[in-house]
């Protein structure tokens, strides 16, 4: 019951621990379990037997390092070797060899895998646990219908149903249902055994008539009847071995395989004692399930809550990798059988090496990591993103739900989620509630359940004991939250505390409490735990904040937050972006590239990450924090990574903000900023883009990398070296050549005019035999070349082309259109950058850095930003940093407000600035207009908030089109920035233009600028010669397309011209 117990206080577990434990479970147990299932394989004459000796398998240390695997687009994996034997039964000879089975991708220190040079992570899936579940539904007459649903390990479902006459049916499909006696008899039980093994035999005897008794008279008859109903087959099928195999494959294997978890759940729910190694559904299970269903009908027993976490199981990385390994072993078995058969037919002598190929295992894992929905590319925007991605839990994926079919009840927060799944952190949109994040202290138990820790309160033991309980156990205990009495239960004045028992909230005496919470953060995910004063925010805004922190861009000069929660250091440590000393010693050398550490009689060189690109184009970089000659201890920070300072997470900047309107520039969440943030490089970030090109061997010959490209201006080729590749350190602009490449082509003489051929013959000009296919810098890619990699794949065949990658760094200051956000869901777009002399300024002359709209606070109910803003001002003046746990009101009422006001008062005293805390309007101050010097009419809240710059930047989004490609069918401009597309003037936009009566603009939008082919071709020529653009005479292409589509439906559409004089109809084709 109590999974784990240890004395003393609890520590926060590693944020990547769930991934590590899952992979270790796969290596320790899952690998051996699947290898043990590999059967002995014999040939058709049973003369040769092949088997694996799995007890001594070996996993070899990887041949390459992680960093090399990323740069060379390889997989960081270990080779699996297993001893195998080939036994000749006639001569009793055995041939034993150690064979290479395949490659298994390994998990690195970040909890991720590197497959084909890409960091990938496997997220946890939440599935319905196999077993039986009872529920009740009302039929069309308002009468309760009780059903029992048996869920198999494969996810297949079978239902038992009891009707008004107390007859029990087994539903094999939506439309077909048969008597419970038929499947029981088909599984091997006769009527006497059924009657002897049920609690209500009279009910089972009441409903079979003579015809039904004949159907279950023998096992063969029952199987035939069951097969007819299940497969909806008419006539009189004949019992045969193939019919049994088909029924076994289509029904019993998919719907009756319970697995070890399903067997445990079935035994618990039905009070059975069937051994755990019998994982198949037995007749005894079906009869016990029917008995419980009858009891439900008579008001005995309890119904199941399908959304309770005790009825769910976590499919972790261990289960997914083990499933894939089992699938690969099945494929290997089939391949070995085929190879043995082929060798015998051709009269060859096989060896274990010849029989086994590594392809099944290697390709299975490559396709799993590349194609499986639960294997995702690791989001590496910032260090927090990496941690949170590995702690996701999803209801989606194979065997799970879909975003369009999941009900509101499944998406909703359940009381059993408390302390296991964060009630705040989930995705927005169609997957809301389906993709969540595990709470900080949650862990995955042996049976796939989510466990959470408690402090056990016992009168016998005076020490504090931490225990982990699964959701099926903790609801039977009296559990109290970590309030003031729980933290200090020596106080006798408070005798009554709130508690939870069986998903109900009670108020009971302290003596009756059995368990209590261990940590204020234990209910939240990592992202939500980094929000200070989260208890003062609306949950929807806290959700937005935890999502937006994952979108923060690492800045060039990071800064620790003044107001935090205390988890920043743990988050930075577990992200792996900082360099940590593995043992104590002395620094003997340090530079930007490496740190050399001497200690324990050895010298260790620690390479540092230098301007490495993440998959979101952000810059990952390490900065040394130790100097030469310094003695360090084990675990000390040697170098800070991206978005970390002093080993703490630092995603944003502490800037001086004011909540006030300013000339309408902060209307609708827009943000007004000072030019200090631009020129002081406060919000400057580096972004690294990757451009690559491959060289192939074509039918005309190999492609060439060269700097001699004909017909191109020398200006575009100025940055190429003698090999035709751009030089390191070059500044490149849009359109510049990064890699010069020529592709061979055959020139046809017939394609040239006679005059061309004559001139070439006279002047001796050679025909060009190659076309230019250079790598050019696209729009918006200007920057500095920081790295070039020329990757030669082994083998050098046409199937392994050479790849050249060019990395370009961009320095981006904050500008109008960029998105910024606080840690309380307060987000906005930069609307204007003011000179610092025009910004509002404080009474000591300090200009404000940002101006937010005060109307963004009351309706959004995220008041935590006001507490952070005021406390940040006090911390900035006193040079203090605050780390505040949530729910501090458990100590006393208004604790947050008292803390903020006391710190403001102290800052006012120590700095001799009475305007910092004015009793008439505490937290507010009178500030002045920078343009006029006059004070504003009302006092304004000013303070220091921690503001993040998000990855949604205007440089990646702004787009314009003068000309470009058109869609083939509609002849309208393509959609999207990547295709150089245009904006579509849709139906509602046309209505808006009609409302203003702008007929000529509307005509241009619908013809010249869109899909009138002839008219848009005439525009360019007439514009050049200065002529008048002719009006389009016929209909645009989209209208003609509509006419054609109507014709395909046998509807002819024509229009007619009516004469004004004689009203004669002149027909004209559309």
Curated annotation (Swiss-Prot):
Cross-referenced Gene3D superfamilies: 2.40.50.100, 2.40.50.150, 3.90.1100.10, DNA-directed RNA polymerase, beta subunit, external 1 domain, DNA-directed RNA polymerase, subunit 2, domain 6, RNA polymerase alpha subunit dimerisation domain, RNA polymerase Rpb2, domain 2
Cellular component, GO annotation: chloroplast; DNA-directed RNA polymerase complex; mitochondrion
GO molecular function, one term: DNA-directed RNA polymerase activity
Reactions mediated catalytically: RNA(n) + a ribonucleoside 5'-triphosphate = RNA(n+1) + diphosphate
Gene Ontology BP term (one): DNA-templated transcription
Function of the molecule: DNA-dependent RNA polymerase catalyzes the transcription of DNA into RNA using the four ribonucleoside triphosphates as substrates.
HAMAP family noted in UniProt: RNApol_bact_RpoB
Protein name: DNA-directed RNA polymerase subunit beta
Naturally occurring in which organism (per UniProt): Nandina domestica
